[in-house]
Regions:
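Acidic, metal-coordinating catalytic segment for phosphate/diphosphate chemistry
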Residues: 1-17
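Short, solvent-exposed loop/turn elements at beta->coil junctions and helix N-caps
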Residues: 6, 75-81
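Residue-level preference for beta-strand/loop junctions
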Residues: 10-12, 38, 86-88
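A structural signal for short, well-ordered beta-strand segments
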Residues: 18, 74, 92-94
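Nudix hydrolase/Nudix homology domain
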Residues: 35-39, 111-163
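Unchanged
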Residues: 47-70, 80-135
Length: 163
């Protein structure tokens, strides 16, 4: 059944996003790409070969916002199948490990001579989140639904295994 949707050359990847909370607000980054309007996402990006989910969440947060953090757990796992692309989306809770302020970082996947895709980093209250286009929408809905419990992860991440 699933093999019917797979195509030679299909792009497959795992994206890891970080939920960072401060005083009831979530940290978001705004992207702008040449082929679409600006949109908001949780800080995150593609899992690199040999990298664990916790390592990716912490690395991406540091690259995009300058914040250092420790991994707290997995909140959500989603899956997206679109023409030519299959993405597993992992949303992880991380806890800042210092006093630093979030600053606009960079996306190392963007060529140095290209226009940056990261445009803004901002703390957003739950009330503000309702009016923002946060992608994917399924994550936005869950973040709003779970706002009252402080986005505490369940014990579902079993860790990496060597074999």
């Amino acid at each position: 059944m699933g093999k019917d949707r797979a195509a030679p050359g299909m792009d497959f990847g795992v994206r890891v996003a970080a939920v960072v909370e401060r005083g009831g607000a979530l940290l978001l980054v705004r992207h702008k790409k040449p082929d679409r309007d600006a949109y908001w996402v949780l800080p995150g990006g593609r899992l690199e070969p040999g990298e664990t989910i916790p390592e990716c969440a912490v690395r991406e947060l540091a690259e995009e916002t300058g914040l250092r953090a420790s991994f707290s757990g997995v909140l959500y796992v989603g899956e997206f199948l679109r023409e030519g692309r299959h993405t597993i989306d992992v949303v992880a809770r991380v806890t800042p490990t210092g006093d630093g302020e979030a600053v606009l970082g960079s996306d190392p996947e963007v060529a140095p001579d290209a226009e940056p895709t990261l445009r803004e980093v901002r703390w957003v209250s739950v009330d503000e989140l309702r009016g923002i286009e946060l992608l994917p929408d399924s994550v936005k809905r869950r973040l709003l639904d779970d706002a009252g419990d402080g986005w505490e992860p369940e014990e579902i991440y079993l860790g990496g295994a060597g074999g």
